[in-house]
Swiss-Prot record:
Belongs to the DEAD box helicase family. eIF4A subfamily. The keyword Transferase does not apply. It catalyses: ATP + H2O = ADP + phosphate + H(+). This is ATP-dependent RNA helicase eIF4A. The keyword RNA-binding applies. It comes from the Eukaryota.
Length: 397
């Protein structure tokens, strides 16, 4: 964990790759047989673009910065790398993975456990909103992989329940989101508490200045891998807008849309928790079945809602951007931005989930006069077109 001067000249927003070797099958990566078995059992057939590029340099021990959106297979990229590098016979934390939200941390834990199914390893999720005592107990058992949110992880390291002496790898997922959520100080503190030799792997959708600073301070001559925007996942997603004259008319517009379209599963995004609750009440009053999720809810509630949504027993989920980061719901065919996102980066996180790995999807944006500028910005930023919604939209979903 040292400095790399080469990063200071990178324009904000995008890194330049300095590594272009690709390995296009898992069999050629020289992985442990138990790990390979887990990868295929999980349903992977061949590596995605980021997996072809990033797994090998991580396994070889390089510090790695990978710039990639959710939906590109990045969780499996670092999960496979971590599992290849840890020693299952050593009951101590050897890899620490940080994520910005509890949901994402739990999802990463599930992937690590599933892919590592034949390896006899433990992976513990160390997240806020759960019992501190349970955390302490689980950490004393020496899980080889710990995945968590910065606050709780920092607390557990300070209290010496999460011991860092055997730590080989530190992974920061969605680094841009973690730093923008105000976790910078805790992340810097965690870096200081890790062994000097710890390998650092950082993943981020965007590369703002605060992320570049972390890479400069704590990474040694990192391999830089950029999965370009056109390789990401707006492809295959039809994007439309509906012009709504006034904010108050969005509700009727949504009700009309419900009448026209048969929805297998949809996510409706609002910008505030209050709006999520308000919209949920209004739709419920109109006899539409919806569930809601945002950061004010406790962990058990959020887990239950996600479970119902994943299993299909709940079909329409109204959420804030909390859900937009990395939560994988396979069968979402429609995303509605009731509010356009407050920043353009979140647009791809919201709608990029509708057509992940080439699955088709439809995104519909409700746009008032105040939103037109933001919509144009989004179009420009992603070099994409958002067209007026056609009358036959039902045929497209």
């Amino acid at each position: 964990m040292a400095t790399d001067k080469g990063l200071e000249d990178i324009p904000e927003g995008q890194i330049e790759s300095n590594y272009d070797e690709t390995v296009d099958s898992f069999d050629e990566m020289n992985l442990k047989p138990e790990l390979l078995r887990g990868i295929y059992a999980y349903g992977f057939e061949r590596p995605s673009a980021i997996q072809q590029r990033a797994i090998m340099p991580v396994i070889k021990g390089h510090d790695v910065i990978a710039q990639a959106q959710s939906g590109t297979g990045k969780t499996a990229t670092f999960s496979i790398s971590v599992l290849q590098k840890i020693d299952p016979s050593l009951k101590a934390c050897q890899a620490l993975i940080l994520a910005p939200t509890r949901e994402l941390a739990q999802q990463i834990q599930k992937v690590v456990v599933a892919i590592g199914d034949f390896m006899n390893i433990e992976c513990h999720a160390c997240i806020g909103g759960t019992s501190v005592r349970d955390d302490m107990k689980a950490l004393q058992d020496g899980p080889q992989v710990v995945v968590g949110t910065p606050g709780r992880v920092h607390d557990m390291i300070q209290r010496r329940f999460l011991k860092t002496d055997s730590m080989k790898m530190f992974v920061l997922d969605e680094a841009d989101e973690m730093l923008s959520r105000g976790f910078t100080e805790q992340i810097y503190d965690i870096f200081q508490l890790l062994p000097q030799s710890t390998q650092v792997v950082l993943l981020s959708a965007t590369m703002p200045q605060d992320v570049l600073e972390v890479t400069t301070k704590f990474m040694r001559e990192p391999v830089r891998i950029l999965v370009k925007k056109d390789e990401l996942t707006l492809e295959g997603i039809k994007q439309f807008y509906i012009a709504v004259e006034k904010e108050e008319w969005k509700l009727d517009t949504l009700s009309d849309l419900y009448e026209t379209v048969t929805i297998t599963q949809a996510v409706i995004f609002c910008n505030t928790r209050r709006k999520v609750d308000w919209l949920t009440d209004k739709l419920t009053a109109r006899d539409f079945t919806v569930s809601a999720m945002h950061g004010d809810m406790d962990q058990a509630q959020r887990d239950l809602i996600m479970k119902e949504f994943r299993s299909g027993s709940s079909r329409v989920l109204i959420a804030t951007d909390l859900l937009a980061r990395g939560i994988d719901v396979q069968q979402v065919s429609l995303v509605i931005n009731y509010d356009l996102p407050a920043n353009r980066e979140n647009y791809i996180h919201r709608i990029g989930r509708g057509g992940r790995f080439g699955r088709k999807g439809v995104a519909i944006n409700f746009v008032t006069a105040d939103d037109v500028r933001m919509m144009r910005e989004i179009e420009q930023f992603y070099s994409t077109q958002i067209e007026e919604m056609p009358m036959n939209v039902a045929d497209l979903i």
